[in-house]
């Protein structure tokens, strides 16, 4: 993937950029792997806003992605590399030898015509999926399961990758993009390689309208609102809110307590924190 920069023909185009899409080989999805996707606009079943800053945007269709990679022993050919509006990564359409078609996340160096497979006997090459116990230490992987058979949960976005640093009994140690080292069951599957489209993070969107096309509405600070709209609103002149940060409902915002997750016991080394001095 490369980035194409616009000429400054308008203020919105000045400095803006877009992906060049040179890796895309087809402009329409596989019909059998598409489902309708209805926009909720951040509302719940009662019509109340539960997630702010969502709404509008271009209509999308959801592409069904194979995150389990459980079709063992059946080789597949990469028929197309396609654009997916629902994620930052590109997706690859696989045609299996038995006639089935599936989508997977497209890793770096995977191209049209390549052969991929999954299972214990698969080769260590980009796009192949294996249990962690069968992947050599030091290999870069993505689309990793947290529970055996549960489907990929980690490292699925553009440019994401995780390194397998060690194996110790029933666990494999993975170094996350954040620097955290975590134990994962060696029976969990992972796909070899790094997720493609890594330059996605370098795109300059240029104008607010392009964010609206993506379904993102403006983010307004509470201190810029009136008292009727937010607990931080109002006051004479500019104020800092006058209290600890809260959400529009008045509940404390930010890091208010320590996390107590059952999976915390699997963390070997936590990521480096940016501590205030």
Curated annotation (Swiss-Prot):
Pfam families: Ribosomal_L2, Ribosomal_L2_C. GO terms for cellular component: large ribosomal subunit. InterPro entries: NA-bd_OB-fold (IPR012340), Rib_uL2_dom2 (IPR014722), Ribosomal_uL2 (IPR002171), Ribosomal_uL2_bac/org-type (IPR005880), Ribosomal_uL2_C (IPR022669), Ribosomal_uL2_CS (IPR022671), Ribosomal_uL2_dom3 (IPR014726), Ribosomal_uL2_RNA-bd_dom (IPR022666). Keywords: Ribonucleoprotein, Ribosomal protein, RNA-binding, rRNA-binding. One of its GO terms (biological process) is cytoplasmic translation. It comes from the Bacteria. Gene3D superfamilies: 2.30.30.30, Nucleic acid-binding proteins, Ribosomal protein L2, domain 3. Residues 37-57, 222-277 are annotated as: Disordered. Residues 268-277 have a biased composition (Basic residues). GO terms for molecular function: rRNA binding; structural constituent of ribosome; transferase activity. Belongs to the universal ribosomal protein uL2 family. Part of the 50S ribosomal subunit. Forms a bridge to the 30S subunit in the 70S ribosome. One of the primary rRNA binding proteins. Required for association of the 30S and 50S subunits to form the 70S ribosome, for tRNA binding and peptide bond formation. It has been suggested to have peptidyltransferase activity; this is somewhat controversial. Makes several contacts with the 16S rRNA in the 70S ribosome. This is Large ribosomal subunit protein uL2. The lineage of its organism: Bacteria, Bacillati, Actinomycetota, Actinomycetes, Frankiales.
């Amino acid at each position: 993937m490369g980035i194409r920069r616009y000429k400054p023909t308008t203020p919105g185009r000045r400095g803006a950029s877009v992906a060049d899409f040179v890796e895309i080989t087809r402009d329409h999805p596989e019909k059998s792997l598409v489902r309708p996707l209805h926009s909720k606009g951040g509302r719940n079943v009662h019509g109340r806003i539960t997630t702010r800053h969502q709404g509008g945007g271009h209509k999308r269709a959801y592409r069904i992605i194979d995150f389990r990679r459980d079709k063992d022993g059946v080789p597949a050919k990469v028929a197309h590399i396609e654009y997916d509006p629902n994620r930052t990564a590109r997706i690859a359409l696989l045609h299996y030898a038995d006639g089935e078609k599936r989508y997977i996340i497209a890793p770096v160096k995977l191209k049209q015509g390549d052969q991929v497979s999954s299972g214990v006997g698969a080769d260590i090459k980009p796009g192949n999926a294996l249990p962690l116990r069968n992947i050599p230490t030091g290999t870069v992987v993505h689309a990793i399961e947290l529970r055996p058979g549960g489907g990929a949960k980690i490292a699925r976005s553009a440019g994401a990758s995780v390194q397998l640093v060690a194996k110790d009994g029933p666990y494999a140690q993975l170094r996350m993009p954040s620097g955290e080292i975590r134990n994962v069951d060696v029976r969990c599957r992972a796909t070899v390689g790094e997720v493609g489209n890594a330059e996605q993070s370098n795109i300059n969107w240029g104008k607010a309208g392009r964010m609206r096309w993506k379904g993102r509405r403006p983010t307004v600070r509470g201190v810029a609102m009136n008292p009727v709209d937010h607990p931080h609103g109002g006051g004479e002149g500019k104020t800092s809110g006058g209290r600890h940060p809260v959400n529009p409902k008045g509940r404390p915002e930010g890091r208010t307590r320590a996390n107590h997750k059952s999976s915390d016991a699997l963390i070997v080394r936590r990521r480096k924190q940016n501590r205030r001095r």
